Amino acid sequence: MRVYCAKNYEEASTLAADLIAAQILLKPDSVLGLATGSTPIGAYQRLIAKYEAGELDLSQVKTMNLDEYRGLDGENPNGYRYFMNHQLFDHVNIKKENTNVPDGKKDPAQACGEYDAKLERSGGIDLQLLGLGHNGHIGFNEPAEEFSKTTHCVDLSESTIEANARFFDSEDQVPRQAYTM
C-alpha cells in the first residue's frame, strides 16, 4: 500500500482524481470502489473535468459503491445512488448498468448477498476510494466494529446519525441502519 500526504483538500482531490484516472488508463475496464460524502466530491469534479477535456473514457469502467442507507431507494435525494448519479455518473460516459450501489430497499440478507455476488462476478475491486468519517468510520464500519469480509447490515452510531443529520430535514429522518462493505 502506498500512502500519500496532501497539504489541503484541493491537493488531495487532485491526487485522488489523478490516481483514479491512471488506473482507468492502465485498465479501461477497471472496477472502482467508490465512496460518498463530502470528501470525494472534489475528486469526482476533477474526473468530470478530465472526461470533458477528452482525457478520460469511462465507458468500460464498473463501480462498486461502499454503502447505502437501509430503507432508501435510488430516487431518494439522501440515498447514495442518487448522490453518485448527481455527483459523477450523470456527467461522464459510464454505463449505468455498470454502476453498483447496495439496494437499500431490500431486506438485509438479500441486499447484502446480492451485492457480494455482484462484487465476486466483477472480479474484485482494482482501486478503492475511501473517506474517513468524523469518528473514524470507513464506509459505515464504526471504529469499535470488527471488519467483515462481506457486505453486511450495521446499526449506525449516534455520532454518525448526528453528523449525517445535516443532509436530512431532521435527525429523526436519518436511517438507523445501513448496508456496507
Could you describe each region identified by the protein language model?
Residues 1-32:
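N-terminal glycine-/serine-/threonine-rich phosphate-binding loop
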Residues 17-25, 48, 52, 85-89, ...:
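Generic structural signal for well-ordered alpha-helical scaffold segments
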Residues 26-52:
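Glycine-rich N-terminal segment of FAD-binding domains in flavoprotein oxidoreductases
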Residues 46-57, 80, 143-153:
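A glycine- and small-aliphatic-rich helix-loop capping segment at beta-alpha/alpha-beta transitions
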Residues 56-128:
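Ligand-binding beta-strand-loop-alpha-helix segment within the catalytic cores
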Residues 123-148:
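Glycine-rich phosphate-binding loop
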Residues 139-181:
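Class I SAM-dependent methyltransferase SAM-binding "motif I" and its flanking Rossmann-like core
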